[in-house]
Amino acid sequence: MSAKAIKFNHHAREKMLKGVNILADSVKVTLGPKGRNVVIAQKYSRPIITKDGVTVAKEIELIDPFENMGAQLTKEVAFQASDSAGDGTTTATVLTQAIVNEGVNAISANMNPIDLKKGIDKCLHYALLELNLLSQNCDNLEKAEQIATISANGEEQIGKLIAQAMERIGTDGVVSVEDAQGYDDELIFKEGLAFDRGYLSPYFINNHEKSTVELNNPSILLLDDKLTHMEDLLPLLEKLANNRNPLLVIAEDINNEVLSRIIGNNMKNNLKVTVIKSPAFGSRRTEILQDLAIYTGGTVISPEIGMDLSEVDTDKLGNASKIIITDSNTTIVHGEGDPQLIMQRIKQLNSQLLNSSSEYDQKKLAERVAKLSGAIAIIKVGAATEVAMKEKKDRVEDALHATKAAIKEGIVPGGGVAYIRIAQTLASLEGDNPDQSFGIKILLKAMESPLKQIAKNAGNEPVEVLSTIKKQTGNFGFDAKNDRYGDMMEFGIIDPTKVTRCALEFAASIASLILTTEVMVADMEDNNANHANHDHAHSLNCSH
């Protein structure tokens, strides 16, 4: 038996609002080039000092379960922004807080939450259309460097390294961030081929700190078929029994029983076998398997050309110096294929690319060329202490994701200016009724909040800065770092369109969810289980 505390309508929203504000107030101080630090206590180590919004959000859990729901929903906005665009977490949090506060006030004034949500949704739709019109291509190294520098909280060295990495390997290449041995940052390149397929079971993980599978000097079986019977694989495993090098099997699909037996064998035998699914589907999968075969010096085993897995010898296997597998990605480092055959394959793919009339096919062929010829970039991050190292690596990861997003989806003027221009354009937008129109105004007003917070964190008067920018047009904005006004594009203060879009989308979505919440249910503490809360909470006994 467990007692539940329940809150209804405005009592629920007020508690949730308090949680939203506690989390947002903790996160938003980090926004902008003069964002403040947040110090986070660690139970068994030194405190973390960070200016990374999502790092702060992760640490916040509130004692009051109802307030905590508001905090956790706001935290979800930061996580979604981070996962989708790699940056914009603090902006998304600031937007959410602004929408929720205005919305709760409107509901308290007897406005309809559903109509408010419809107004917010309508405004969001048109705001995203305007954002696309504002967006420009990120088509040169200088712009990429500016994006990376801004996302790394103004560290120009990090911006340079990320831009150089992007120039060399492109947006589809692999960039990893690692600890440096000393204090200096550096960029190094290694050969490698990566594709979007991860391990099929956590039991394959052998680097538990990074939650990855790392195979040194592995053999590689490329199977253009489903692996449905363990007996088909056993003859090859017997031939490799005395080989201490691991085996990676890449197959179209793997039967669950076969997967279980492989995991069981790994626990008993010296030969460690890892299985992943082939990248892509259909004929494209067959072509990519052939790319992998050429890159690793192996042969694709396919029943369509009369090859039987049970008769495969070890000379058909590919090889590499290392393979790293995450939950979603596999990277083959230093495949042992013939360099001349690899170059011939690249020329063949480039020829297909030139002759293709399909935009989709061109994109996929270009990706394959990049992967066959591309390198893996490694950014080594240096710092004086372990705490500083972790904080810096977080910023490099953010900057890396933001730069990739900018190259793929374009850029807009930064510093909150894009939102201001969109809000000005949509100032006359109306809903189907007064409450919907007010919902539109809620989102338009919320779009002013990132710029105001950037100005506040820089020690300026937010209303004054906002007023000055509204009197101008286009890219005119406020450079908080250097305390000046002017063209944000010329200043190099730019944001990825994707980051700007995702922050607004996720903030509007979660805020609307909070505003349309009427009931909250939480576990009641034992010492309160027999008492009703004085603020209209009710207890409900539930048996499990």
Curated annotation (Swiss-Prot):
Q: Which organism is it from?
A: Psychromonas ingrahamii (strain DSM 17664 / CCUG 51855 / 37)
| UniProt entry tagged with the keyword Chaperone | yes
On subunit structure and binding partners, the annotation says: Forms a cylinder of 14 subunits composed of two heptameric rings stacked back-to-back. Interacts with the co-chaperonin GroES.
What is a single cellular component term in the Gene Ontology annotation? cytoplasm
- What's one GO MF term for it? unfolded protein binding
Q: Name one Pfam family in it.
A: Cpn60_TCP1
Tell me the protein's name. Answer: Chaperonin GroEL 3
Catalytic class of the enzyme: isomerase
Q: Where in the cell?
A: Cytoplasm
What Gene3D superfamilies does this protein map onto? GroEL, GroEL-like equatorial domain, TCP-1-like chaperonin intermediate domain
The protein's Enzyme Commission number: 5.6.1.7
Name the residues that bind ATP: 30-33, 51, 87-91, 415, 495
Main localization category: cytoplasm
What role does it play? Answer: Together with its co-chaperonin GroES, plays an essential role in assisting protein folding. The GroEL-GroES system forms a nano-cage that allows encapsulation of the non-native substrate proteins and provides a physical environment optimized to promote and accelerate protein folding.
User: NCBIfam families attached here?
Assistant: GroEL (TIGR02348), PRK00013.1 (NF000592), PRK12849.1 (NF009487), PRK12850.1 (NF009488), PRK12851.1 (NF009489)
Indicate the family of this protein. Belongs to the chaperonin (HSP60) family.
Report the superkingdom from the record. Bacteria
Picking any one GO biological process from the record gives: protein refolding
Reactions catalysed according to its record: ATP + H2O + a folded polypeptide = ADP + phosphate + an unfolded polypeptide
Keyword Nucleotide-binding present in the record's keywords: the answer is yes
Write the record's keywords in alphabetical order, separated by commas.
ATP-binding, Chaperone, Cytoplasm, Isomerase, Nucleotide-binding
